[in-house]
Amino acid sequence: VIQIGCDPKADSTMNLLGGEPLRPVMNYMREEDEEPEYLEDIAKEGFGNVLCIETGGPTPGLGCAGRGIIATFQLLEDLKLFETYKPDVVLYDVLGDVVCGGFAAPIREDYAEKVLIVTSGEKMALYAADNISKAVQNFEDRSYARVFGIVLNHRNVENETEKVQNFAKERGFDIVGEI
C-alpha cells in the first residue's frame, strides 16, 4: 500500500509515521534546489508497511499547489515508484476543495480507477465530498476514475448517519464502510 498526501498541509501520513512529519516533495525540491535521485529521499515506510509520500506545496503566496502535485506525480513516474513497489492499493489523500485541476490529477490523470470519498456529517466535510464527486463527474465521459462509494467517518455530529446517507442517496452512491 502506498499513501500519497496531495494537500499543501502535508499532514496526510503523519499518523502512519507515529506523529513524525514527512519532508514533502516540494520542500525537498525547494530546499535542495534539485529533484531527488531516489524514492528513499522523499518516501518513508510507516505503520503496516504503508509507503508514505507527501506532495506539499509552494512557498505561501508564491506558486501553485496544484502544479506542485502534477510535478510530484511526474517525478514519481520518473523514479519508477509504481514499477518498483508494485502496490495493490494506492491511496491519494486529496484536498476537498478540488477547485484546481492540479488537485484533481489523481482522478483525471489515470492514476486512480476508483474513488472512495471519506466524509463525516460535518457541513464542510460534506461540502468537500460534494466537490470531489463533482470533479469525478466532470471526467466521467473520459473513462477516468469513478466514485466507488462513501466511507462514513463518524465525528459524533447530530444526525450524522442520516446526513451522510441522504448525501450518498442523492448522488447515487453507496456507503461502503464506516469508521
Task: Name each region found by the language model.
Residues C6, G66-I70, L126, D130:
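Electropositive phosphate-/nucleotide-binding environments in soluble metabolic enzymes
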Residues G57-R67, K123-M124:
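Flexible beta-alpha connector loops of hexameric P-loop NTPases
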